[in-house]
Structures are given as C-alpha cells and as structure tokens.
C-alpha cells in the first residue's frame, strides 16, 4: 500500500494527462450527443413539414398522403396533373404514357428474323390507343420488318375510314389491315425503289422472293378494351386476377378447323418434323408465303376483350417463348416482377420517342429490331424486368428459336 501511494505521489504528470484525456473524451462525447440531438430535431421538423404538405395536397376523397400523379404533356415534360384546366398549358394535350417492357434476342438461331413494333398513341385523334406488335419471320426477315414498319399505319388508316366520321368495327379493321399488309408484302419487288437495297434472300435467289413470310400478333390497347389480331403461332395472353387468359389461338396445321380448311382448299398437311403445310410450313396462317396460297392465309382471328379492374398484364411473344414456357408460368413471372418492384410510378417516355412514335433508330445484330422505341429502352422497370426474365427463362429451357417478348402493365388505380 505504501509503495502504491508513493508511486502515485511521484508521478503527477501521468495523473494530469489522464485527467486531460478524460476531459477531452467527455467533451467529444458531449459534442457527438449534441450533433445527434440537432440532427434528430432537423429530421423531426422535416417530417412535420412533409406531413403538413401532404395534408394540404389531399384530395376531396379524404385520402391524405397520396402523392399527386404525374402526367406528361405532348412535349414529354412531367408536371402535376391538376384538376384546374386553367392552370394547364394550352399547347399540347395531357397524356399518360403506357407502361411496357420489351426484350428480343436471336437466341440459338444463326439469324434474327423477329421484329417488334411499339407505337404509343398511334391514333392521336381518337384518344389513348397504343399499338403493340410481334412479328416472327421465316425464310427471311424482310416480311417481318415490313410488317414492323407498316402495320400500325395500315391499322390507323383502316380505323379512320368509317363513313361520316364513324369508326369502323375493330374486327373489320384488323381483317382489312392484314389483307393489305399481305398484299404489300407480295408486291414488294415492284414497289421497292432503286435506291433501296435488295433483301439478301432476293440477291441469292430472286425467284424465291415469295418463299418468305411472318407471323403477326397485334394488340391495340385502349382504356376500355384490348383488341388482338393474330395470324400464325405467336401469341397474346392476358393475366386477369392471377388467371392466364389466352387472347389468341396458335394457327397450327393440325388444329382440327385449320386442317379442314387446308384440305378443303386442296392442300395437304404432311408430318415432317411436326405437322406442316405441304410438308414445308409449320403454321397455317401468316403474312406472305405466296407460294403456299391459298392453303396458308393471312386472314387473322380477332378478339375484342373488355378491360376490367382485375387485369394485370398483357404478354405478346413469339413462339420462341411459348414453345418452352406455359401461359401460367409466364403470367406468374410477370406478377412476381410486379410484386418485387412495388406500385408502378408514372411511366417515362423513352428518350427520342415522340408522341406519334413514328421514328426510331433501327439496328441489326443479335437483338431484334424494335420500331417506335429504341430496342434497349422500355417505359417501366417492372415490365422490362419481366420481359428480360421471360427471355432468360426461354433460353434456359433450350428454346431453339428467336425470342421476342413484350409485357404491358394493365393495372389500374395504382
């Protein structure tokens, strides 16, 4: 005990140093505590201000906390969707951009013969009508790309042909549009300008120009309806309250009604690596394929489906997906992506896409050519994730064809 007391008495500098260190530590702790308190007060004041702002923004329906939904003018600039018309700019109508995602890949094929067309607001004078199309070419890609460039224009022209300003029924519109599209493809050689390069298939074998064709599944989505026209084995499926509903039926040569039609026209269905028209084509309806007419027809089957609050999504895809993925599985994948991404934000117009969506950069290569949007862009992350995941699923399941997928969000009130 004496030694300890003596040592403490003989080392006053150490005691002073310890005291200074303790004082500094206490001062630092007090400073940190003070900073935390100030930050806590700032956060509390910020929460109070946000709560006050949200109460002021609450609508007459008494739902505080709802953020104002963003709308977009024709110029693409976002702004709040106020109810007062006087506060809206007089130039440019208000439009809510559709939510969609698209993915298209060559897959295990040597060449890319798929084409995708997305044309938001393709009927500007008739309200919010959005055009989506998937075209799966065979023999060559020129028929699919021609459909990609022209189908929406033909549909718009036929839609506006009603007498005395009346709108023609959608069934008639689609049937006439597909017939016109088929005629344009058949007359391609005579209508092609000298400056336009010839298709590779024409350069190699000019006499086989009519040996190419394409499927066509087209959807026109309005606020109240989904109109689908299909020729071939591409498919449209809608998910409604968790249940997949096919809006088109594949045109296979061995489908009983198609087999009867082909045989009535004098043709035959030969089983050569599956059922094929004259042993050649594995589908019974398509755009083009002039050498197989009248057995292969371009007449589409058209469905007009009324939209409901239970509708979740619309999926358009080539048979590269549907050959290996069921309707149920595809809808489950999309719903999972929607769930993981939460409620959708207002869709953003992809850069460079005007409201008429008539011009876009076209690129060749491994990915499909997508007109109306840049092939790398979608307007909604959840839809884009779903389209990408479905494509990867098809490739993982050894799909042997090009794979093109379009996913459209149909949910309301979000």
From Swiss-Prot:
GO MF terms, alphabetically ordered: metal ion binding; protein serine/threonine phosphatase activity
Residues engaged in binding Mn(2+) 1: 136-137
Membrane topology: Single-pass membrane protein
Coiled-coil region list: none
UniProt EC number: 3.1.3.16
Alphabetical list of SMART domains matching this protein: PP2Cc
Transmembrane region(s): 15-37
Region described as Disordered: spans on this chain: 56-95, 186-212, 345-372
Cofactor: Mg(2+); Mn(2+)
CDD domains associated with the record: PP2Cc
The record's free-text note on cofactor binding: Binds 2 magnesium or manganese ions per subunit.
GO cellular component: membrane; nucleus
Location of this chain's protein in the cell: Membrane
Residues reported to bind Mn(2+) 2: 136, 319, 401
Name of the protein in its database record: Probable protein phosphatase 2C 9
Organism whose genome encodes this protein: Oryza sativa subsp. japonica (Rice)
């Amino acid at each position: 005990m004496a030694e300890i007391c003596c040592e403490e008495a003989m080392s006053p500098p150490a005691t002073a140093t310890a005291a200074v260190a303790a004082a500094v530590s206490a001062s630092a702790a007090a400073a940190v505590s003070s900073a935390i308190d100030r930050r806590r007060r700032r956060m509390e004041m910020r929460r109070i201000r946000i709560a006050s702002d949200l109460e002021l923004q609450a609508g007459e329906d008494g739902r505080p906390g709802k953020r104002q939904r963003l709308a977009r003018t024709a110029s693409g600039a976002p702004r709040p969707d106020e109810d007062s018309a006087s506060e809206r700019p007089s130039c440019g109508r208000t439009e809510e951009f559709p939510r969609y995602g698209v993915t298209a890949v060559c897959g295990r094929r040597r060449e890319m013969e798929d084409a995708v067309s997305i044309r938001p607001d393709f009927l500007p004078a008739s309200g919010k009508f959005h055009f989506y199309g998937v075209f799966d070419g065979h023999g060559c890609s020129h028929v699919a790309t021609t459909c990609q460039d022209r189908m929406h224009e033909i549909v718009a022209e036929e839609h506006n042909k009603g007498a005395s300003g009346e709108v023609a029924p959608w069934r008639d519109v689609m049937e006439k549009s597909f017939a016109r599209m088929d005629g344009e493809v058949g007359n391609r050689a005579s209508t092609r300008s000298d400056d336009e390069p010839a298709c590779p298939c024409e350069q190699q074998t000019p006499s086989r120009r009519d040996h190419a064709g394409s499927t066509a599944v087209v959807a026109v989505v309005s606020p109240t309806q989904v109109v689908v026209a299909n020729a071939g084995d591409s498919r449209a499926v809608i998910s409604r309250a968790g249940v997949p509903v096919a809006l088109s039926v594949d045109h296979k040569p061995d489908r009983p009604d198609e087999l009867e039609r082909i045989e009535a026209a004098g043709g035959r269905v030969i089983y050569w690596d599956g059922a094929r028209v004259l042993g050649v084509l594995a589908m019974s309806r398509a755009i083009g394929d002039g050498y197989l007419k009248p057995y292969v027809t371009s007449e589409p089957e058209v469905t007009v489906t009324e939209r409901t609050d239970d509708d979740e999504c619309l999926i358009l895809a080539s048979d590269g997906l549907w050959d290996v993925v069921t309707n149920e599985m595809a809808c489950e994948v999309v719903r999972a992506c929607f769930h993981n991404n939460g409620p959708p934000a207002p869709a953003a117009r992809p850069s460079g896409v005007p409201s008429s969506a008539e011009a876009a950069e076209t690129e060749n290569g491994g990915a499909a050519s997508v007109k109306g949007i840049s092939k790398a862009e979608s307007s909604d992350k959840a839809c884009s994730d779903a389209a990408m995941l479905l494509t990867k699923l098809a490739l993982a399941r050894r799909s042997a064809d090009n794979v093109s997928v379009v996913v459209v969000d149909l949910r309301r009130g979000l």
